[in-house]
Amino acid sequence: MIITFFALSRLGYTVMMLSTRLSAVACDFLLNIASCDTVLYGQSRSVRTIMGELLRLRPVACRPIVQRSSLDEAEKSSSVFVLNRAQRPENQVDKPGIILHSSGSTGLPKPLFVSHGSTAKSFTRGNELSTFNPLPWFHAHGLNSAMQAMYKRKTAFMWNASLPLTTNGLTKALEAAQPEFFTTVPYALQLLVDDPRGISALRKCKSVSYGGAPCPDELGDRLQSERIRVGGAFGL
């Protein structure tokens, strides 16, 4: 997915990131507003089911995302592909670079058009720390934190989307990655503070941040009492 995202952007396409939790009706609604006629999708059973339902709602070209095994088997080449852009970068600043969307918790999701200029500003303002964010890239908080780390040439650790978020799994991942900066949603922080090992792993981070939802007072007080350096991120 990561390679596909960068490849499409490099080729000049505006990429819309759809949540795997959306219904076919919600996907159809967003595709219509964005005038999108092609969908690249993952290989999980739930995603394939949604794609089948989507095809019954609208004619759209569907292409599976290239899997890692296919890339490993690809013929290696020392040649470098030079992309000649038809548009000058300065003329693209105000045009959409990425399309995200709201959760749709109160109805159909709303598209969020993010310009190239806004994207560049957001991606380049990182804190120069290795980062772990278990949120997927269709979540603005997950996308921004990963890109900010990459731009600063720091490691961006990500979660395996095929695995559920659990206290044990998240604690083990945090212990293995040992990031300087851990950022996620309050729900994941609650999972970690429920385990002494999770609290210990959070203490080792230089900074811990949450976004995407307000942090409950009880959780915030607990993090502070455990001497975890935590703060909130707003406006992503």
Q: Can you name each region flagged by the protein language model?
A:
Residues 1-5, 9-40, 110-113, 133, ...:
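Short beta-strand->loop structural element characteristic of the AMP-binding/adenylate-forming
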Residues 8, 96, 102-105, 131, ...:
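Conserved S/T- and glycine-rich ATP-binding loop of Class I adenylate-forming
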Residues 12, 105, 153, 212:
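Conserved G/P- and acidic residue-centered "switch" motifs that form tight phosphate/ATP-binding loops
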Residues 20-53, 73-79, 118-132, 165-180:
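Conserved ATP-dependent adenylate/AMP-binding module captured primarily in the ANL superfamily
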Residues 44-96, 108:
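ANL superfamily adenylate-forming
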Residues 88-124:
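Conserved AMP-binding A3 loop
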Residues 119-130, 138-183, 188-191, 195:
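Conserved AMP-binding/adenylation subdomain of ANL enzymes
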Residues 179-183, 193-236:
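Gly/Ser/Thr-rich phosphate-binding loop
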